[in-house]
Every structure is written in structure tokens, then in C-alpha cells.
Amino acid sequence: MRRIVLAVLLLAMVAGCEWPGDVAPLAPKKRPVAERPAVNLPLALRQSNWWGTGGQGSCTWATMVSLLRWQGRYRMADWVRQNCGDGEWPDDMAQRLDEAGVRYAYVTNGDVKFLEWACRTRRGCGITIRGGQHMVALVHLDEKWAALLDDNAVEQYIWVPRETLIAEWKASDGWAVTPIYAPAAPLPQ
């Protein structure tokens, strides 16, 4: 019995028991800062553009590969990288994604709510720019700013005013596409 009492006393001394009145009140926590950009894809997972077998750039597919990796679909991203290439149009890409069993959503009507949803849910989306001749990943969209990941220069994000980006996107066919899987968890605060 003495050993048990001695062990409990020893544990209490080591654990540092305090009375409820002795504990300092919790300091108010700062509001966590949202990760910027919302889709903060590590450099190693960003897919650069490549030349397809038809001699065209593969920006739509490179963007899809990056977004699939962000959403944890690495094998699917590798399959897309190995089996798809060249330029693509919305209906053709939809057909290929359907055949591959990829879950996705897209718009071709310039609906800004789709962009907001894709960024709010941290999925991001591919969007057309330059008159519909190029696709980049929209990785952030807030009240003032948009961030793009261009597969022709994956080293850094391109920040542009929101309204400038939306006007460019709408003038470029208003096509946006994203895979629909769970995105990566946010960085710890």
C-alpha cells in the first residue's frame, strides 16, 4: 500500500497538479489566416505543359494533372499524363474524362459562381484565357484577387485583380473544369 501511495505522490509531483484557480486563463487566439492561395500545390506536384503527339501544347491536360494531384488522385493524374495530350475542347475533354472514369464538373457559359465554388472548396479549376487558346489553373479567388498557376511557368503563382481575370476568362469562352474529389488539407495554422 505504501508503494501505491508513494507512486501516486511521485506522479502528482512529476505531472504538476494544479488547482483550477491556479491555471492562467486562456489567451484569446488570433483568427487563423486563410492559406493563400487556396490551392497551394507544392512545386513538385505542378505539371508543366508538354508537346502532344499532334504537335500541340497540352495545357488543358497539364492543368488537369496538377488538379488531380492536388486532390490526391496520383495514379489517375499519371494516366492522364501518359495517355492524353495536345489541345482540347470542352466536349472532347468531357468525353475523354468520362471514358477514363474521372469525376469532374465544368461550365462553358462564364458562370463566375463556378469559379467561386471551385476555389471556396479548395479544388481549383482550369480556366481558358488568351481568347480560349490557353488553359491555366485558377488556384485562388477572393473579393479582390485571383491567383493563376500557368503550366508554362509553374515556379510561381500569377496574381491578378479579380475583375481583370474574370473579364479575360469570359472573353476567352468562359470554360472552366475541375475534377471533383477531396482536396488536400490546409496547412496547419
Predicted features and spans:
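Conserved active-site-adjacent core of cysteine acyl-enzyme catalytic domains
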Residues: 18-43, 68-188
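Positively charged n-region of N-terminal signal peptides that target proteins for export
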Residues: 1-4
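C-terminal motif of bacterial Sec signal peptides marking the signal peptidase cleavage site
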Residues: 14-16
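A short glycine/serine-rich beta->alpha loop
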Residues: 44-54
